[in-house]
Amino acid sequence: MANALGFRDLGLIDYETAWHAMQRFTDGRGREAGDEVWLVQHPPVFTQGQSGKAEHLLLPGNIPVVQVDRGGQVTYHGPGQLVAYLMLDVRRLGFGVRDLVTRIENTLIALLADYGVTAAAKADAPGVYVDGAKIASLGLRIRNGCSFHGLALNVDMDLEPFRRINPCGYAGLAMTQLSDQAGQIEFSEVSVRLRAQLVKHLDYAEQATLTGGINQYD
């Protein structure tokens, strides 16, 4: 079992600021560096993964599109969506990529179960689904044995922008969110519960709250 998993709660932050900081954190970390999770929300943005195809961007309109270095195709981020960026030394943890994905999916399934929502993963389409509608997306990059990017859970947000794309490359894929499934919820409580489930499913001994922002990685 690993030691503490550190969490930074960064609030609403520009996507590209977070992305470039993730890259610098990953490229600069030593073998003894602690693992971190950054909890954020983003202003509206579409992100296109490495295997993304232009035809899946239907009508982006005034929402910016950012080409990024994670796996997968196009997705949407916006306020009311809880994003967790996982900067983990997966080589030290002993996880393969498929194992890591499964652990993240199980984290989300357990979190949703806390709210009485039954969710499941799909073998051929990473993410978490409720009655066939996608409630959480995953996208990772592994570099030098360390992960970055992570997960996005739809909590209480405007889902309309998902209709401007084929989410994750699937035409007509229905999207849902926790507030539609469980009623009124506190965003901050979801974040706290996600922290606990990540520590459990990623086999850490405990969690730690990290202070300070990510300006150190500018």
From Swiss-Prot:
The keyword Transferase applies. Pathway: Protein modification; protein lipoylation via endogenous pathway; protein N(6)-(lipoyl)lysine from octanoyl-[acyl-carrier-protein]: step 1/2. Disulfide bonds: none annotated. Keywords: Acyltransferase, Cytoplasm, Transferase. The active site is at C168 (acyl-thioester intermediate). GO terms for molecular function: lipoyl(octanoyl) transferase activity. Substrate binds at R70, G71, G72, Q73, V74, T75, Y76, H77, S137, L138, G139, G150, L151, A152. It comes from the Bacteria. CDD domains: LipB. In the reaction, the free carboxyl group of octanoic acid is attached via an amide linkage to the epsilon-amino group of a specific lysine residue of lipoyl domains of lipoate-dependent enzymes. Belongs to the LipB family. This is Octanoyltransferase.
